Swiss-Prot record:
GO CC terms, sorted: plasma membrane
Protein name: COBRA-like protein 2
Record organism: Oryza sativa subsp. japonica
Glycosylation site positions: N38, N163, N171, N211, N236, N318, N333, N352
Membrane topology: Single-pass membrane protein
Keyword Signal: yes
Name of the coding gene: BC1L2
This protein's UniProt keywords: Glycoprotein, Membrane, Signal, Transmembrane, Transmembrane helix
Pfam families: COB_C, COBRA
Length: 458
């Protein structure tokens, strides 16, 4: 009996450990700033064909602040049967695969595990489809919901031809453009999607709808940091630079970084690596492609002012549709944000300590490559809340900053520019007490000398 109980306990323990291990990816994927953020893939079968179906596949970026930048998304899956792709509109498979079994009417793709990408802007009209042809770039949901959606049409053959015989694809993978996303199983949605005509007078319905949800995890992405933060203030001469080696360390390997004043700069930038996704950064102690500088600029009676500067140190990438997320307790009292768009994310309900900022369209929504034009800046005006406001102990600096969804490396809090000792309340109190003591002593000595002088005359 004891052996049986011991064995049962061991099995229960193993089951518990297995459950925890299964939960790890999901726990890592949880984003406290955007707990419901995800990318949803909707697969709508709209028409049956003699050997398969026609489907509309739509990708929704429901993430508040994380977008998909160039070279864009790529979506992969594995067929449940021996399906093929006869044709596509609004997207294309990256590889055709082995279609040698077909003598005529060659399919678009015969691979068991196709991977599809978006078409680039300017694609031929007969290849386009609604919400296509953005080069795979999707904005975040907060910035521009209309451009946070992509669609393509796919004609599938050698599959089922009814609701009972058709099977959903499996093993979905999403790259945007690199790793980081984990996708779940395709789930059938009931009732299926309904489509409204352009004139709004007719509604049609998909035969079958499947949904796939993909979530982002920095643990899965395993990316090195891509940005860092530096700090300064009007009340302290100290400039706190980005931490050394925040995104990597300089090495002696040629081409690992470029000096900004190098006479060979143009030849290196336009060299063999041009067009590569690997950053070519200016040689700095931090080696980050992006630096965010927070400067406490001015202090008024009822307000205080901050200047934020984003600098691109990467010679190989323009950052289009960039965004910045900042956590600071005084965003509850933000008054004006100049030259940036602004929206509170409110991840904790009523507490407003997280703000998202991005560029104004056609003005500063494009962060140019490293160089004279490789920066954007704004100023923020905060109203003072007398119950919480202070410049003491680094309170005026942000708790956390994210650029394009990636957490930036912050300086150590003990390095933050603090108020000089003469500005602290404790020092002012001691100074006042000492002043009263000195004045009292002088008054006492004065009176004592006057009395001694008068008594001497008596």
């Amino acid at each position: 009996m004891a052996r049986f109980l011991l064995g049962a306990a061991a099995i229960a323990l193993l089951a518990g450990v297995s459950s925890l291990l299964l939960m790890v990816p999901f726990a890592e994927a949880y984003d406290p700033l955007d707990p419901n953020g995800n990318i949803t893939i909707k697969w709508d079968i709209t028409q049956w064909t003699p050997d398969g179906y026609v489907a509309v596949v739509t990708i929704y970026n429901f993430q508040k602040y994380r977008h998909i930048q160039a070279p864009g998304w790529s979506l992969g899956w594995a067929w449940a049967k021996k399906e093929i792709i006869w044709s596509m509109a609004g997207g294309q498979a990256t590889e055709q695969g082995d279609c040698s079994a077909f003598k005529a009417n060659i399919p678009h793709c015969c691979k068991r595990d196709p991977r599809v990408v978006d078409l680039v802007p300017g694609a031929p009209y007969n290849m386009q489809f609604g919400n296509c042809c953005k080069g795979g770039v999707l904005t975040s949901w907060v910035q521009d919901p209309l451009n946070a959606v992509a669609s393509f049409q796919i004609t599938v053959g050698h599959s089922g031809t009814s609701n009972k015989t058709v099977k959903a694809p499996k093993n979905f993978t999403l790259k945007a453009p690199g790793p980081g996303y984990s996708c779940g199983l395709a789930q059938e949605v009931k009732p299926p999607t309904r489509f409204i005509s352009l004139d709004g007078r007719r509604t049609t319905q998909a035969h079958v709808t499947w949904n796939v949800t993909c979530t982002y995890s920095q643990f899965v992405a395993q990316r090195a940091p891509t940005c860092c933060v530096s700090l300064s203030s009007f009340y302290n001469e100290t400039i706190v630079n980005c931490p050394k080696c925040a995104c990597g360390c300089q090495n002696k390997k040629p081409g690992s970084c470029v000096e900004g004043n190098s006479p060979y700069l143009a030849s290196v930038v336009n060299g063999p690596g041009k067009g590569s996704l690997t950053p070519l950064v200016q040689c700095t102690p931090h080696m980050c492609p992006i630096r965010v500088h927070w400067h406490v600029k001015l202090n008024y009676r009822d307000y205080w002012r901050v200047k934020v500067t984003i600098t691109n140190w990467n010679y190989r990438m323009n950052y289009s549709q960039w965004n910045l997320v900042v956590q600071h307790p005084n965003f509850e009292n933000v008054s004006t944000v100049f030259s940036f768009n602004y929206k509170s994310l409110n991840p904790y309900g009523v507490i407003n300590d997280t703000a998202m900022m991005w560029g104004v369209k056609y003005y500063n929504d494009l962060l140019m490559v490293a160089g004279p034009d490789g920066n954007v800046q704004s100023e923020l005006l905060f109203r003072k809340d007398r119950s919480t406001f202070t410049f003491d102990k680094g309170w005026a600096f942000p708790r956390r900053i994210y650029f394009n969804g990636e957490s930036c490396v912050m300086p150590s809090p003990d390095l933050y520019p603090w108020l000089p000792p003469s500005s602290t309340p404790r020092f002012r109190t001691v100074f006042l007490l000492m002043s009263f003591l000195v004045c009292g002593t002088l008054a006492f000595l004065h009176n004592h000398l006057v009395l001694d002088k008068n008594c001497g005359k008596c």
